[in-house]
């Protein structure tokens, strides 16, 4: 385990790409122990000059879309291209143990054994916001360790699409054709955040369904406002199982990066993501500090009960809480 005495040496080993040190650094960053958090802050500050040169990808999709099969095929393609690949898999968590249920390593056999790959599951513990914070910090560790591509993967439910899109360069939505899932994706506003839509499982007797779904997505994209002026989102198809169409997806990602880098937009996006991350973390820290105050916690619960019982309007409750905070912290 990394400690104060070994921090400098651990940073050196991390910069050399030592997998064991990377795993230890991730464990340190994930720890909620106050001493570990203070040490991980020093670690993250020290590696920041070495971050920013990695391509950050987000991959999301509903259960059954074949994300693990796709990531296995895609990751192995990148390795054959001479690149180092890290996968950060934000998994659903066991409500009992808080641990990862799916265990992505067991579903990506070849990739997990590859020397140029690193896979790390991040249990969400039922709260995606906290998981996305850790995923962002783990991504920075991978960048400092010299990984060329970092992929953040999550289940496409709830707010997961926007959470992932806010921390990556290129956001990829993995879909399947048939069963109404294609239309459902359009209704969810998925099109507003996706840079690439990939329809998987274009194999067997599914070619017709895939072609219909592709036309549907392309039609929707043409009537929606672009996320970036420099980029028209593309709809691609593949069979991750048969490893077909994977190289076209990589070429499209390169086109995306080239277009946004040339205009300076990619740098702007990353800067804005950092600002939003700081703002969100500030809000969470302030709330944690407030609720750690027993007087505020008690007053909040009393106010909440009054609002529940309709003896106090939410607006008045908010005003009273604001006045309480003003008295406690600013007067």
Residue ranges and their predicted role:
Residues 62:
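P-loop (Walker A) phosphate-binding loop of NTP-binding proteins
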Residues 22-24, 237, 248-326:
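Long, well-ordered amphipathic alpha-helical subdomains in the mid-to-C-terminal portions
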Residues 179-208:
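Flexible active-site lid/hinge loop adjacent to a nucleotide/diphosphate
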Residues 101, 138, 163, 167, ...:
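Alpha-helical scaffold elements adjacent to nucleotide-binding pockets in ATP/GTP-utilizing enzyme cores
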Residues 196, 202-259:
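Canonical P-loop GTPase G-domain recognition
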Residues 6-57, 65, 71-160, 167-174, ...:
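Nucleotide-state-sensitive switch-loop elements of NTP-binding domains
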Residues 106-107, 183-188, 223-227:
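Short beta-strand/turn micro-motifs at beta-sheet edges
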Residues 10-11, 65, 122, 199-203, ...:
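Short hinge/gating elements
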């Amino acid at each position: 385990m990394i400690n104060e005495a070994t921090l400098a040496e651990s940073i050196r080993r991390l910069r050399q790409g030592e997998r064991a040190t990377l795993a230890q650094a991730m464990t340190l960053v994930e720890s909620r122990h106050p001493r570990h958090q203070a040490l991980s802050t020093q670690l993250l500050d020290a590696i920041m000059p070495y971050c920013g040169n990695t391509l950050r990808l987000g991959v999301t999709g509903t259960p059954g879309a074949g994300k693990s099969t796709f990531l296995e095929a895609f990751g192995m393609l990148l390795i054959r291209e001479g690149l180092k690949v890290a996968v950060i898999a934000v998994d659903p968590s066991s409500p009992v143990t808080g641990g990862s249920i799916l265990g992505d390593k067991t579903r990506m056999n070849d990739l997990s054994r590859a020397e140029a790959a690193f896979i790390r599951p991040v249990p969400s513990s039922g709260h995606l916001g906290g998981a996305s914070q850790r995923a962002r910090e783990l991504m920075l560790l991978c960048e400092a360790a010299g990984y060329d591509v970092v992929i953040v993967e999550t289940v496409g439910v709830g707010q997961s699409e926007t959470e992932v899109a806010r921390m990556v360069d290129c956001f990829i939505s993995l879909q399947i054709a048939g069963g109404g899932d294609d239309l459902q994706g359009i209704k969810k506003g998925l099109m507003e955040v996706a840079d690439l839509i990939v329809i998987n499982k274009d194999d067997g007797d599914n070619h017709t369904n895939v072609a219909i779904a592709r036309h549907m997505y392309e039609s929707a994209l043409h009537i929606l406002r672009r996320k970036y002026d420099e980029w028209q989102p593309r709809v691609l198809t593949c069979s991750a199982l048969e490893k077909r169409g994977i190289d076209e997806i990589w070429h499209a990602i390169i086109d995306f990066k080239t277009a946004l880098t040339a205009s300076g937009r990619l740098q702007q996006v990353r800067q804005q993501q950092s600002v939003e991350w700081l703002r969100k973390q500030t809000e969470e820290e302030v709330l944690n500090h407030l609720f750690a105050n027993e007087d505020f916690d008690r007053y909040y619960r009393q106010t909440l009960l009054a609002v529940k019982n309709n003896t106090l309007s939410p607006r008045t409750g908010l005003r009273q809480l604001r006045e309480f905070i003003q008295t406690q912290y600013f007067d």
